[in-house]
């Protein structure tokens, strides 16, 4: 009798937690996407700062590949300085003009446009990063 009562309570608890687990998973995926967007934005801002304040005057370039939508790299003086591999569920796409983004010595971007991050488990949501002309300001929008 106690065994049946225990199994019944466990079954009831599992049924009550099941809808919540989908909601928790969705929230986890949203946070994963946001974190990736802010990581990319921070890397772009760091590139701009390095170009402005490094005495060596290296050129930093962010490169996004057409073939591999799960990574990007930053090159310094045409050598890989940083390579970032994204989660397999997150894809990165960008406009053609901004596939190779760098900043000049005044902090102005050489290309303007946007990057889009999407999560495979969240078809109705994405994060958009835009690089503003002249200032090079990076903005992150969630849609």
PLM regions and their residue ranges:
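N-terminal helix-rich module
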Residues: 16-38, 42, 46-49, 53, ...
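N-terminal single-pass transmembrane signal-anchor helix
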Residues: 1-24
């Amino acid at each position: 009798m106690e065994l049946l009562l225990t199994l019944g309570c466990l079954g009831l608890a599992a049924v009550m937690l099941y809808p919540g687990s989908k909601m928790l998973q969705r929230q986890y995926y949203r946070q994963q996407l946001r974190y990736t967007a802010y990581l990319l934005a921070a890397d772009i801002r760091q590139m701009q700062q390095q170009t402005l304040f490094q005495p060596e005057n290296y050129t930093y370039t962010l490169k996004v590949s057409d073939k591999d939508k799960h990574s990007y790299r930053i090159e310094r003086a045409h050598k890989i300085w940083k390579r970032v591999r994204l989660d397999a569920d997150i894809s990165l796409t960008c406009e053609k003009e901004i596939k190779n983004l760098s900043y000049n010595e005044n902090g102005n971007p050489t290309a303007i446009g946007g990057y889009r991050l999407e999560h495979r488990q969240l078809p109705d949501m994405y994060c958009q990063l835009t690089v503003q002309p002249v200032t090079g300001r990076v903005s992150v929008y969630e849609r």
